Amino acid sequence: GYRLPLDERVLADTDTLFVFGLDHLLTEQEASSDEIEAVRDWLGREGTCLVLGPHHDVGISLDMKERAMEYAHHGDALVPRQQRFGKYTRSLMAGLGVPVENRYGLRPGVVAGTSRIAPLTAYRDLDTRGWLDGVTNFSFHKHLPHYAVTTDDTSAIKVLGTQPIDMSKPHPFTEAGNREFNSFVWMPPGGARAGEILMADSTVFSTLFGADDSLKQFWTNLATAK
């Protein structure tokens, strides 16, 4: 393959841009200053929407017992005790001033007696754009990131959806008292940025992990937003 930077060739006729973070941190991929500037300029155009989806960050702790706990929690033998994703997306977020970090790989809860993912806790009073209209749940995946908000400025960024966690096996995040993780985040236009920024995991946009009417409605909401 070869490197194709984000520039006017990609952005000139684009309204909605998806940037998913499935690059391992070990590959040390980062957005260049030119790419960050190009995306910032693009977001200055009204009607644009940037969807960011850095994947999980499993095993950040140096404590091997914590890593073992995370591994047992998500229950996926294919994922090692340390698997960290998204340096490119993280660098783009830092350059654009997105105050969010992708943390952990958390197993979502399911509807009792089924394998269906538990419904989202949707904060519809904050969802003035209707991103989650008609949406009750995303798709099940064994290890999903918590999108930790790193600012107290609630006008700049809004958590619109949180996901209940599978509590059957412990995790450092649940041991700290958490029962849900941030799964859908929205940054409304602000300052010189006329466009919007959304954060949802890349698995939400793949049929590989199932696609029911709720998920299809979410895709429709994004595709038809004006």
Locate predicted features.
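Short, surface-exposed patches at the edges or C-terminal ends of soluble domains, predominantly
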Residues: 1-226
